[in-house]
Amino acid sequence: IKDEKAKLIKEKKIKKEKILAPITDDEKPFDIPESWEWVRLGEIGDWGAGATPAKGNTYYYNNGTIPWLRTGDLNNGTIKNVEMRITEKALSECSLRICNIGDVLIAMYGATIGKVAIAGIKLTTNQACCACTPLCLYNKYLFYFLQANKDVFIKMGAGGAQPNISREKIINTLFPLPPLAEQHRIVEKIEELLTMIERLKLK
């Protein structure tokens, strides 16, 4: 992952970030197999939030063709379409990030904190959503990890008038990283169990 990140920084595809704090033994919440590794979320992908083009500038929205996701669009599944569109002018002038197919999205503000999705189309997002382009990581493993830890993110955001988490809090979150083949096996088992649960609900 570190080599892949260094390569992308060199190619100017992602920005160089400040080094995240080393993980101490006291921080580790539980034991993991020897073949796994504790990392921070910021180490396993390129994370970034979006922006909202000024609503008063109609040329940012009228006849727009670029999907612009708001956190209400997050569906705990795959995003195939969103209601709002923005223009190429908005994309070039408003610090928006293009999310690629397969990127993992998480809501950071208000009642939607911790809600997740996977981008099934190329899109942009507002500032209330943080997107991750995974590096040498199975995106569905990250998706299910974030989904399982929704309550953790909600607790992180507690305390203000409107609860919110920041990109900084997300990238510093601990993440148990198994080998890639094992990530695929874990996801396969999760989806097998989810299918079984849905069948039982129908009985």
Predicted regions and their residues:
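Short, well-ordered beta-strand elements within core beta-sheets of diverse protein domains
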Residues: 27-32, 130-134, 171-177
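Specificity-determining recognition surfaces
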Residues: 148-173
